[in-house]
């Protein structure tokens, strides 16, 4: 489990931006899980309408904003996600082996950030040339932001 904050909001989040949604696998909310969900990870809806770790880069994804291990989140097996309006945030959940450049278009992918001890997380990487969903743009590179990638996400 990461001991450093994995995600920090730069712009305010209004109530209309947040949605509490059930997760398909409540064990991912437990810190003892081998690969638990962490704040800032991207989640998508499965065929049952529940949230799962994002794996399909052609579908919309939303950022998880609950801290890992919260008892209330585990009790209701639901998490809070955002991504309705434009927002800016700093994240460690990105591919730091191929760190996105300033202005880069971002997509969802399974990523590792060795510097932050995050492995196989659903996060951000530089957009490929295919039909993947655009998740945001880099507005400050990690090297100039304490290791965090600053992202501007603007989607409906």
Show which residues each predicted segment covers.
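Surface-exposed, low-hydrophobicity beta-strand/loop segments enriched in small/polar/acidic residues
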Residues: 1-156
């Amino acid at each position: 489990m990461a001991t450093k904050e994995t995600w920090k909001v730069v712009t305010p989040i209004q109530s209309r931006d947040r949605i509490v949604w059930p997760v398909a696998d409540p064990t991912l909310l437990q810190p003892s899980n081998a690969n638990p969900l962490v704040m800032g990870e991207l989640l998508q809806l499965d065929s049952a309408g529940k949230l799962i770790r994002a794996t399909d880069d052609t579908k919309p994804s939303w950022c998880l904003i609950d801290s890992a291990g919260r008892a209330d989140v585990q009790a209701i097996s639901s998490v809070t996600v955002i991504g309705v309006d434009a927002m800016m945030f700093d994240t460690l959940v990105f591919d730091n082996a191929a760190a996105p450049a300033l202005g880069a278009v971002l997509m969802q992918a399974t990523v590792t950030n060795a510097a932050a001890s995050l492995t196989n997380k659903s996060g951000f990487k530089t957009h490929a040339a295919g039909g993947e969903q655009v998740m945001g743009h880099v507005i400050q590179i990690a090297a100039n932001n304490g290791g965090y990638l600053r992202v501007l996400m603007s989607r409906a």
